[in-house]
Amino acid sequence: MLSQSFNNTGTPFFPSIAKDSTLSKVLEVVECCLLGFPEKCWQTMFNRDNTLTPDNVDETDFNTELSHHLSLEFAFFSLSGQFTVRPEYPENRSQASHSKKGLRRQIDLAVRSANGKRILAIEGKRLHDPNDKQYVRGNTGGIARFKREDHGKELGFACMVGYVQQETFAFWHKKVNQWISNEMSTVGNTISWDESDLLSTPESRSECLVACQSIHLRLKEAPIALTHYWVSMVHLR
């Protein structure tokens, strides 16, 4: 179970995850998958569509491959009978109506238990354009969706996956936190942003994978904790 605590200034600490919990087991599989994702992704992506290149691949292509390889990873660990990975539909009627209008608001992927209970929500975003703030907010903005409870409303923990297509992890860490800082100083924002929204210093998992953490206040629900996995696709160009 996730446990949420606060320090004496009211800033939430990142929640601990019990070592042998279901969520911990799922996160281990997700991380194992992402460690080998860049090479495996390109191999299967080109087999599926030989018109794809590093310049025309989009977010949906990456998320489709991630869903496929996560399913294979759960099977490799003999867990495919316990968990399923699938794209998600809009999480409520309001989102469904937005989808009909062409506004994509559903979470990208979810890991569910055998009884259908959602264990983990995963939102995938490209990090490819220093002027594209969709990782933080916008028409399909990532972090803001969690803060507004459009994504993962019933969860206390979720993941974002950033597909880095240019620049370095350090560049994007600085850029994303800059975008968040700008939201903190924006007058009239419909959702509240503060220092807890800032991403922690990236922790290296491999040459091609880092992880950051953040905590986000929400409209009504308790704060949600996010682990941000950034996977480098730069060397595939």
Regions found by a protein language model. Give the residues of each.
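Active-site-adjacent loop/helix micro-motif of nuclease/hydrolase catalytic cores
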Residues: 120, 129-141
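Well-ordered, non-membrane alpha-helical segments in soluble/globular domains
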Residues: 35, 61-67, 138-145
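C-terminal tail/extension regions appended to the core domain(s) of diverse proteins
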Residues: 1-56, 70-76, 133-136, 149-157, ...
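Active-site metal-binding core of divalent-cation-utilizing nuclease and nuclease-like domains
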Residues: 82-117
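Conserved catalytic cores of phosphodiester-cleaving nucleases, focusing on short active-site segments
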Residues: 109-111, 120-128, 146
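Conserved beta-strand segments of the P-loop GTPase G domain that flank and frequently precede/overlap
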Residues: 123, 160-164
